[in-house]
């Protein structure tokens, strides 16, 4: 009952307040108030109660962290893009200024130049000098130590029988193939004739008197 009395009082107040107003706005406001009051009265009479409003959704824990990380990731990506854009502008500006770009030579060219400038050093090989006959004769004449071998073998008998150099040494002569062939063939024929004659006369008598 009290609710009905309150509703009646509200209607009266609404009528008193809306009475002096004229125009479209006043009519719209009065219509809204009446609809609101009629809906309220119908809900009270039927016994239905309007559901309570839903509380606002609260986010916390992992949701907040994910939001923060997403925001921080966006900021980091934006900063990286800005830095790359600045570097590109600086590189373009440096190229426009006409700066000298260093030229790096190829490795093959460098190696070829080094090999061309290098000079091969002569090989250092120790060669034992071969003694000539003259050196041997001089050593035998001057040094008595060479007359004995290992301090035990006496070489005096051998040195006495040695022929002089001019008898043993031969002159260097260029050989002619035809001449050499004729000399060798004549020597062989002479030896063959001598053998044939010895076979015919086994007593050793000369074949020609």
From Swiss-Prot:
Biased composition (Basic and acidic residues): 75-85
First and last residue of the signal peptide: none
Gene Ontology CC: one annotated term: intraciliary transport particle A
Bias (Polar residues): 28-45
Region (Disordered): 1-100
Coiled-coil intervals: none
PTM sites of type N-acetylmethionine: 1
Location relative to the cell: Cytoplasm, Cytoskeleton; Cell projection, Cilium
UniProt entry tagged with the keyword Ribonucleoprotein: no
UniProt KW keywords: Acetylation, Cell projection, Cilium biogenesis/degradation, Cytoplasm, Cytoskeleton, Phosphoprotein
InterPro entries: IFT43
Biological process per Gene Ontology, one example term: cilium assembly
Statement: the UniProt record of this protein carries the keyword Phosphoprotein: yes
Modified residues (Phosphoserine): 77
Similarity annotation: Belongs to the IFT43 family.
Name of the protein in question: Intraflagellar transport protein 43 homolog
């Amino acid at each position: 009952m009290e609710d009905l009395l309150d509703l009646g009082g509200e209607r009266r107040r609404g009528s008193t307040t809306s009475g002096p107003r004229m125009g479209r706005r006043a009519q719209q406001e009065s219509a809204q108030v009446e609809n609101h009051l009629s809906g309220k009265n119908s809900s009270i009479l039927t016994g239905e109660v309007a559901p309570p409003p839903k509380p606002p959704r609260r986010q916390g824990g992992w949701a907040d962290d994910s939001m923060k990380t997403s925001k921080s990731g966006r900021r980091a990506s934006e900063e990286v893009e800005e830095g790359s854009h600045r570097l590109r502008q600086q590189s373009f500006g440096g190229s426009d200024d006409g700066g000298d770009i260093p030229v790096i030579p190829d490795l093959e060219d460098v190696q070829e130049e080094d090999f061309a400038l290098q000079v091969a050093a002569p090989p250092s090989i120790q060669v034992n000098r071969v003694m000539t006959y003259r050196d041997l004769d001089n050593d035998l004449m001057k040094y008595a130590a060479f007359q004995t071998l290992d301090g035990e073998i006496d070489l005096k008998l051998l040195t006495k029988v040695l022929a002089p150099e001019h008898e043993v040494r031969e002159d260097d002569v260029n050989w002619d193939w035809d001449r050499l062939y004729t000399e060798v063939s004549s020597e062989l024929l002479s030896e063959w004739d001598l053998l044939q004659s010895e076979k015919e006369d086994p007593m050793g008598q000369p074949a020609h008197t």
